[in-house]
Regions:
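Conserved ATP-binding/catalytic segment of the ANL
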Residues: 11-16, 22-88, 97, 113, ...
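C-terminal boundary motif of the adenylate-forming
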Residues: 58-60, 65, 78, 94-122, ...
Length: 205
């Protein structure tokens, strides 16, 4: 297996630089086809469309000086406020260090030709999302990342949608925020949770 981190143009990046996780040589555990995909089109689109001839795994990562990898989130869920790419895991890591926060989900919302960062939090029972708690979350994120990571809007939700394997579904929530149809609802363990993100008045201005 030959693992490399590449930018959007396919150039190999050095340690500490964030980009797409790719493999340029085959490896024993890679799938060779998808079920019900006789032409192989879905398989090719999933892994080989972005960089022809290279396996693109779909993770936004950086290589360490020792050859390890830090994963910042799925590359298709990377935020892009002001043209700066931000991995969602960088925000989760800080937001969920706040005692009152059980879990969180962050998406980018298109607004006025740019992307604003919107953070949803599920709080411990009996905790209200006050302005003081919002400030505490923002301060924690700003202190340990960059000002670009700080969410413009923070909202609370009673539940966060996830797949049947337990992964949160940022893209589905992002589509809800933009009024788009949701694909593969039957893949979600709790599709009703999407209703908590729909038609939020705080997101219309």
């Amino acid at each position: 297996m030959k693992v490399e981190v590449r930018d959007d143009q396919g150039n190999v990046l050095g340690p500490g630089e964030k980009g797409e996780l790719t493999c340029s040589k085959s490896f024993p555990s890679m799938p060779i086809r998808f079920w019900n995909d006789p032409t192989g089109d879905k398989y090719h689109a999933a892994y080989f469309d972005k960089f022809p001839g290279l396996w693109c795994h779909g993770d936004y990562v950086a290589e360490t000086d020792h050859g390890g990898l830090v994963i910042y989130g799925r590359s298709d869920a990377v935020l892009n406020p002001g043209g700066v790419r931000i991995g969602t895991a960088e925000i989760y890591r800080e937001a969920e260090q706040v005692d009152e926060v059980i879990e969180s989900l962050v998406v980018g919302q298109q607004r006025a030709g740019d992307v604003r960062v919107v953070l949803f939090v599920r709080l411990r029972e009996g905790i209200a999302l006050t302005d003081d708690l919002r400030d505490q979350i923002r301060k924690r994120i700003r202190s340990n990342t960059t000002p670009r990571h700080v969410p413009e809007i923070i909202l609370d939700v009673p539940d966060i949608p996830r797949t049947k394997s337990g992964k949160i579904v940022e893209l589905a929530v992002q589509r809800v925020l933009h009024g788009e149809a949701i694909k593969n609802l039957n893949a979600l363990a709790n599709p009703e949770a999407l209703d908590y993100f729909r038609d939020r008045p705080e997101l219309t201005s």
